[in-house]
């Protein structure tokens, strides 16, 4: 049977740790859950199509539902703060000293495009968990899909986790303002 196995990179972590990966379907954001499946008029009544059916919204799209419920999330193990340091540069503080290497500042990538509205300086997640996959399988590591509410944007990559299940860094850029991520926030 083909299975995804998560291997802890830290000896003290287990399946009950707050950073334990979880199925995306168990961590659907509130804004998605609370969105209306059918369009409402300004008076609160549902809009009706000529055939008498309700007018669907984006939430009724099966392709969007599949994206919002497929895969696994990697998460932050503690609170993380992005701030402007005394050199007037974006910096990061990981609130738990045992997890200081979870998020680190990286060397510049001058020839790699960066999205508008994000700092040119970039960081990397060093996840608490590695992924082990059956022979012939690879994993797509991406910014959490359709999560425009997060204050960072991750670089996307594919890793052959059937051959490599060592911890890997996952580069990302922070939005051009200070922000804080709470523990258990999804990062990939």
Label each PLM-derived region with a short phrase.
Residues 1-167, 175-179, 184, 188:
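Non-catalytic terminal segments and appended small domains
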């Amino acid at each position: 049977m083909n299975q995804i196995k998560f291997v802890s990179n830290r000896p003290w972590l287990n399946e009950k740790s707050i950073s334990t990966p979880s199925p995306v379907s168990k961590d659907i954001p509130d804004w998605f859950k609370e969105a209306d499946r059918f369009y409402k008029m300004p008076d609160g009544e549902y809009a009706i199509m000529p055939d008498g059916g309700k007018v669907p919204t984006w939430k009724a799209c099966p392709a969007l539902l599949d994206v919002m419920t497929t895969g696994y999330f990697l998460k932050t193990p503690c609170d993380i703060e992005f701030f402007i340091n005394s050199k007037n540069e974006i910096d990061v503080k990981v609130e738990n000293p045992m997890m200081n290497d979870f998020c680190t500042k990286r060397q510049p990538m001058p020839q790699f495009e960066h999205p508008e509205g994000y700092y040119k300086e970039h960081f990397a997640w060093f996840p608490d968990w590695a992924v082990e996959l059956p022979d012939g399988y690879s994993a797509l590591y991406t910014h959490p899909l359709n999560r425009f509410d997060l204050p960072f944007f991750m670089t996307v990559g594919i890793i052959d986790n059937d051959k490599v299940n060592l911890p890997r860094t996952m580069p990302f850029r922070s939005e051009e303002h200070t922000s804080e991520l709470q523990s258990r926030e999804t990062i990939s």
